[in-house]
C-alpha cells in the first residue's frame, strides 16, 4: 500500500513539474513590463471580423496565405485589433480586425489591387502602452491572455488611464514575441 501511495505521489509530482515546465516555456513566469512608446505608420492588411475572437488565427492565416500565394508578398507579423471586452460583450457581437503587417510592397503590386480582397490602413501615429511577451507558438497567446490582460487592467486602473478602447496584439514571429498595444 505504501509503494502505491508513493508511486501516486511521484506521478502527481511529475505531472505538476511537467505542467509548470510547459507553462514556463510559453511565458507563464515572464515578467510583465509596461512601457509608454511612440508608434505608428505600420501598414495593416486585414479583414473585419464579428464574433468570437477564437476566429483570429484562421483569419490571420487566410490573409497571410492569400498575400503570399496571390500577391507574392511574404509577411512576418500578424496582428489582431480587439475592440470589445469579452467580459462585457456577447461573443457573437465582438468586433476585431485581423490580418498581417505589410513591411514592403513589391513594385508590381498596388494598394488598390490588394484592396479588392482586404482592408488596408495605417496604425495611427501616437503614444501607446506597450507590453512584450514571449511568442513560442499558439499556446503563448493563451498564456499571454491569462497573464497580460489582468496585469494591463490593474495598470490602467492604478494609473487612471481610460479602460475603453481597442487592444492590439502583434505576433512578431521573427523576434519571437507578442506585442500588446493600447493607445493612451
Segments from the language model and where they lie:
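A solvent-exposed interaction/effector surface
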Residues: 2-184
Amino acid at each position: 500500500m505504501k509503494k502505491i501511495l508513493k508511486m501516486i505521489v511521484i506521478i502527481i509530482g511529475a505531472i505538476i513539474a511537467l505542467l509548470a515546465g510547459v507553462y514556463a516555456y510559453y511565458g507563464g513566469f515572464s515578467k510583465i513590463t509596461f512601457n509608454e512608446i511612440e508608434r505608428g505608420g505600420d501598414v495593416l492588411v486585414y479583414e473585419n471580423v464579428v464574433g468570437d475572437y477564437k476566429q483570429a488565427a484562421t483569419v490571420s492565416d487566410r490573409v497571410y496565405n492569400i498575400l503570399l500565394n496571390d500577391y507574392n508578398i511574404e509577411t512576418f507579423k500578424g496582428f489582431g485589433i480587439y475592440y470589445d471586452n469579452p467580459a462585457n460583450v456577447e461573443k457573437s457581437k465582438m468586433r476585431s480586425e485581423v490580418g498581417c503587417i505589410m513591411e514592403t510592397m513589391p513594385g508590381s503590386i498596388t494598394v488598390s489591387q490588394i484592396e479588392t480582397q482586404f482592408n488596408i490602413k495605417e496604425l495611427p501615429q501616437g503614444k501607446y502602452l506597450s507590453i512584450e511577451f514571449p511568442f513560442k507558438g499558439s499556446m503563448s497567446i493563451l498564456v499571454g491572455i491569462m497573464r497580460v490582460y489582468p496585469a494591463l487592467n490593474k495598470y490602467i486602473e492604478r494609473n487612471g488611464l481610460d479602460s475603453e478602447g481597442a487592444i492590439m496584439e502583434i505576433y512578431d514571429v521573427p523576434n519571437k514575441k507578442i506585442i500588446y498595444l493600447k493607445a493612451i
